[in-house]
UniProtKB/Swiss-Prot annotation:
NCBIfam families: cbiD
A Pfam family this chain is assigned to: CbiD
Pathway(s) per entry: Cofactor biosynthesis; adenosylcobalamin biosynthesis; cob(II)yrinate a,c-diamide from sirohydrochlorin (anaerobic route): step 6/10
Organism, scientific name: Pyrobaculum aerophilum (strain ATCC 51768 / DSM 7523 / JCM 9630 / CIP 104966 / NBRC 100827 / IM2)
Protein name in the entry: Cobalt-precorrin-5B C(1)-methyltransferase
GO molecular function: cobalt-precorrin-5B C1-methyltransferase activity
Enzyme Commission (EC) number: 2.1.1.195
Domain of life where this protein originates: Archaea
Transmembrane parts of this sequence: none
Catalytic activity reported: Co-precorrin-5B + S-adenosyl-L-methionine = Co-precorrin-6A + S-adenosyl-L-homocysteine
């Protein structure tokens, strides 16, 4: 990968940095930058745009930096306001942070869209300064920017989501990324007969827990990675993925990026028809905005749906003339189903 491409920070890391800066300000310190921990063990320095006070509340703002990623949220201001407490960290969403209205997402309906990992990052950053605090996360332009994201389709209203599993946004360049996949697969071929592939950070960790340090992170480029594994002479490919991406693979999509394909709920409906689910279930699922919501609405049929989608994805990917096994994991990295 081009070493000159710039990495960025997630909205979750930006919120954690703002929260730590606000916590420092509550102790009379005006920070120009803060260093915050990440789930991958790195500490990242983030510049602070400004600090200010609202009565007994202390606020700080940082600017999200997306590096060389084409991201509509690049440069957005993330604000955190802190009210010191004796103990415990309470995290809330405010202006410009979306509210979840549908089931099936990592955050339950009715709550602000601050995902579990960013919540932990915010708490850890604040606890480096204070014993306890109430933290309010705000995004002044969040409501306007949300219209340019997938949030409206996912049933998240009124703002953006605070996301990220590592805190770091890797630079995206299609050609560079494909070259990186090929290089990793080539290097590992001497050690392995089976290519171990993972689509995202959660899938990657789950695969590492089973297979160790031989996992290749492939993002959305599933077809390319499987085809390259076949060309390099691997005897098989094992793919770790999550239900949302799996649904696209089950439709025959080899690039699972949202700009390339969708139809995820349709994949769930197909599986339900194969399972002879009643019309009422089909109708309910047809109104889902995400695979997570669709599976929640599918109820007792959810396990069968995942199994059918995994087997269909396996059939499509084996068109590259290599045996493929699918491991489906949830957002905790637990294996829900495998075709092995």
């Amino acid at each position: 990968m081009n070493p000159f491409l710039k990495y960025g920070i997630t909205t979750g890391l930006a919120a954690a940095a703002a929260a730590k800066a606000a916590a420092l300000y509550s102790k009379g310190i005006v920070p120009k930058s803060v260093t915050v921990p990440t789930p991958i063990g790195l500490r990242v320095e983030v510049f602070v745009e400004r600090v200010f006070q609202r009565g007994e509340i202390y606020c700080a703002e940082v600017r999200k930096f997306s590096g060389d990623n084409p991201d509509v949220l690049n440069g957005v201001i993330i604000r955190a306001c802190v009210r010191p407490l004796n103990n415990g960290v309470v995290i809330k969403g405010g202006e410009g942070v979306g509210i979840v209205t549908r089931p099936g997402l990592p955050v339950p309906p009715g709550e602000h869209a601050i995902n579990p990992v960013p919540r932990r990052m915010i708490e850890e950053a604040v606890r480096e300064v204070l014993e306890g605090a109430e933290v309010l996360v705000e995004v002044p332009d969040g409501k306007l920017l949300a219209e340019k994201t997938m949030n409206p389709r996912l049933g998240i209203v009124g703002g953006i989501s605070i996301l990220g599993t590592t805190g770091i946004e890797a630079p995206v360049s299609a050609d560079e990324f494909l070259g990186h996949i090929e290089a990793e697969l080539s290097a590992l071929r001497e050690r392995r007969d089976i290519a171990i592939l993972a689509q995202g950070n959660t899938s990657y960790k789950a695969a590492q827990a089973v297979f160790g340090d031989v996992v290749v992170k492939i993002g959305d480029m599933v077809g390319y990675a499987v085809e390259k594994a076949a060309a390099l002479g691997y005897k098989a490919a094992y793919l770790f993925t999550m239900p949302g991406k799996l649904a696209k693979l089950a439709l025959g999509a080899y690039n699972t990026h949202s700009a390339q394909c969708d139809g995820r709920v349709e994949a769930v409906l197909y599986a339900l028809v194969k399972l002879r689910a009643p019309y009422e279930v089909l109708l309910e699922v047809s109104n889902a905005a995400s695979v997570g919501e669709a599976l929640a609405k599918a109820g007792d049929y959810a396990g069968g749906v995942i199994a059918i989608m995994a087997r269909r994805a396996k059939e499509y990917l084996e068109r590259f003339k290599i045996p493929v096994e699918i491991y489906v994991v949830n957002d905790k990295g637990e294996v829900l189903f495998s075709t092995t």
